[in-house]
């Protein structure tokens, strides 16, 4: 086989979609000479990263976990969101043996069922339809005490949009004639993923001990008070919902706890606080002996709790296939997206493959990334340039977090700076590749930074989008790019560029035609 250019670098610009509209489009507003030059001189197109094209419901915006799964698998991966929704529609959810075992054990002892999860129609980490179904299931199975501990979104949804979701669940419980919302707290606390354990502690103590900074007699009153304090949904402080004559809800021995987030990365820390016997990240006043703690999906193999929807193994994903062919690969990202470029890109596998190395660059310790829109991109780029110069790797996969993480802040000026930083970083990579004769593919996992304001409300747009994402070839070869590509087509494209045959399990189609 003739030698192919080396290395082949896959650059994933997280949250970097394409919008025809210049309005509140941080990419359009940024000074980006490198990006402009690439689009003027290199083969490029657009590919889809949302909806059915990535195994999500129609019209559902893509996200980082889903995007990286599809990119690495080389096939459309049927997402947990869709699996759970389908199980609810088919009725299988209500007989799920793992959830049923925990609920039935609590019911038999006249104990409570606690439902945890992000109460949101966002569909990124959870969906409120699933929380409604869980409340219905608990009631059907005879639970008299059903409590929802609602984590509020404002990140994958508009910043102040929780009220309809709270009202919907209040109505669900009213219709069941039992159960209620017991607490609300922003996802900033309950769903940390960066080992900021003081945040997780606030959520744990609210749920388990009923310890809250604030109390209110209804969920909507709790939310209104938070807004009056200047908090948006994501940052709502621990609030116990205590109707007149009631007490703050606590988790007691013999209760069942069901965590209804389907995405793993932001559910791990709180889960560990509940179930790890030797948990030491913060002191727990109470560690109740539960009838069961159920993860909706497997948040991590190391968490000692059952999951209702275990992973469906993927074989011959890109990383595995490269290893089988004796190829070397480097995965690199900063903390915020490290799991995506390793665990998710490898189809849900924690361990590196043979010949795979990983570099984790710490994300800056700032409260929100608009305060440092460059994040750790320059340091990530230093290591990539070094790796390209060494010519040790056949493939380098890198994630740049800026577009997504700064996009989520809703701060337009910071998002523009993030894009300008990315442009500089891409310039350094392209220059390094030019010197060694390497190639790159530049794409994204989903959109975000190209829409920074919600046109209908005038609020900051902090969520992902359904826009297509760019696909750019960087190199010396003559090739053409077809239209209609999806994220699942990227891995087959890489194999085409490397001269490797595509395995049968990869059902994606190469986006490029050589020659």
From Swiss-Prot:
GO cellular component: a single term: cytosol
Positions with a binding annotation for substrate: 125, 155-156, 187, 193, 263-266, 337
CDD domains for this protein: iPGM (cd16010)
Keywords: Glycolysis, Isomerase, Manganese, Metal-binding
Note on cofactor: Binds 2 manganese ions per subunit.
One GO biological process term: glycolytic process
Residues reported to bind Mn(2+) 1: 404, 408, 464
Residues at the active site: 64
GO MF annotations, alphabetized: manganese ion binding; phosphoglycerate mutase activity
Residues the entry annotates as binding Mn(2+) 2: 14, 64, 445-446
Catalysed reactions, as listed in the record: (2R)-2-phosphoglycerate = (2R)-3-phosphoglycerate
Source organism, top-level taxon: Bacteria
InterPro entries xref list: Alkaline_phosphatase_core_sf, BPG-indep_PGM_N, Metalloenzyme, PGAM_B_sf, Pgm_bpd_ind
Family annotation (Pfam families): iPGM_N, Metalloenzyme
Broad EC category: isomerase
EC code: 5.4.2.12
Cofactor: Mn(2+)
Associated pathway: Carbohydrate degradation; glycolysis; pyruvate from D-glyceraldehyde 3-phosphate: step 3/5
Subunit structure as annotated in this protein's UniProt entry: Monomer.
PANTHER family xrefs: 2,3-BISPHOSPHOGLYCERATE-INDEPENDENT PHOSPHOGLYCERATE MUTASE (PTHR31637:SF0)
Family affiliation: Belongs to the BPG-independent phosphoglycerate mutase family.
Function, as annotated: Catalyzes the interconversion of 2-phosphoglycerate and 3-phosphoglycerate.
HAMAP family xrefs: GpmI
Name listed for the protein in its UniProt record: 2,3-bisphosphoglycerate-independent phosphoglycerate mutase
Native source species: Pseudomonas aeruginosa (strain UCBPP-PA14)
Lineage of source species: Bacteria, Pseudomonadati, Pseudomonadota, Gammaproteobacteria, Pseudomonadales
Gene name in the database record: gpmI
């Amino acid at each position: 086989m003739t030698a192919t250019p080396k290395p082949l670098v896959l650059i994933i610009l997280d949250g970097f979609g394409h919008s025809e509209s210049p309005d509140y489009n941080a990419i359009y507003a940024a000074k980006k000479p490198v990006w402009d030059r690439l689009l003027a001189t290199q083969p490029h197109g657009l590919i889809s990263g949302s909806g059915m094209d990535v195994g999500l419901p129609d019209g559902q915006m893509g996200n980082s976990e889903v995007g990286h799964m599809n990119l690495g698998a080389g096939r459309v991966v049927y997402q947990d969101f869709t699996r759970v929704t389908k199980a609810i529609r088919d009725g299988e959810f209500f007989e799920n043996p793992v959830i049923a075992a925990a609920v039935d054990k609590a019911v038999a002892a006249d104990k409570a069922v606690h439902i945890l999860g992000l109460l949101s129609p966002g569909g990124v980490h959870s969906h409120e339809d699933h929380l409604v179904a869980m409340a219905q299931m608990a009631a059907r199975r005879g639970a008299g005490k059903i409590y929802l501990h609602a984590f509020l979104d404002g990140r994958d949804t508009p910043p102040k949009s929780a009220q309809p979701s709270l009202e919907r669940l209040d109505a669900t419980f009213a219709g069941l004639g039992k159960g209620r919302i017991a607490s609300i707290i922003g996802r900033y606390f309950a769903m940390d993923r960066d080992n900021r354990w003081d945040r997780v502690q606030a959520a744990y103590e609210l749920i388990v001990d009923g310890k809250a900074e604030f109390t209110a007699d209804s969920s909507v009153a709790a939310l209104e008070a938070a807004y009056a304090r200047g908090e948006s949904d994501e940052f709502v402080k621990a609030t116990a919902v205590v109707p007149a004559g009631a007490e703050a809800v606590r988790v007691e021995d013999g209760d069942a706890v069901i965590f209804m987030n389907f995405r793993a990365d932001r559910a791990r820390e709180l889960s560990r606080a509940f179930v790890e016997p030797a948990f030491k990240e913060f002191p727990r006043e109470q560690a109740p002996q539960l009838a069961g703690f159920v993860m909706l999906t497997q948040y991590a193999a190391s968490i000692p709790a059952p999951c209702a929807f275990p992973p469906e193994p993927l074989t011959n994903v890109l990383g595995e296939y490269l290893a089988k062919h004796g190829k070397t690969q480097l995965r690199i990202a900063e903390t915020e997206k490290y799991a995506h470029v390793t665990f998710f890109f490898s189809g849900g596998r924690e361990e590196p493959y043979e010949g795979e190395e990983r570099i984790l660059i710490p994300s800056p310790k700032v409260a929100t990334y608009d305060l440092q829109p460059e994040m750790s991109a320059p340091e990530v780029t230093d290591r990539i340039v070094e790796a390209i110069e060494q010519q040790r790797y056949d493939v380098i996969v890198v994630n740049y977090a800026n577009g997504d993480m700064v996009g989520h802040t809703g701060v337009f000026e910071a998002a523009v700076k993030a894009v300008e930083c990315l442009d500089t970083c891409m310039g350094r990579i392209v220059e390094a590749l030019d010197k060694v004769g390497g190639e790159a593919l530049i794409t994204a996992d989903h959109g975000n930074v190209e829409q920074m304001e919600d046109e209908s409300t005038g609020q900051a747009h902090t969520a992902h989008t359904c826009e297509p994402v760019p696909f750019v070839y960087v190199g010396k070869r003559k090739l053409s790019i077809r239209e209609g590509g999806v994220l699942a087509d990227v891995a087959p494209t890489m194999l085409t560029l490397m001269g490797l045959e595509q395995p049968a399990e990869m059902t994606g189609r190469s986006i490029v035609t050589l020659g």
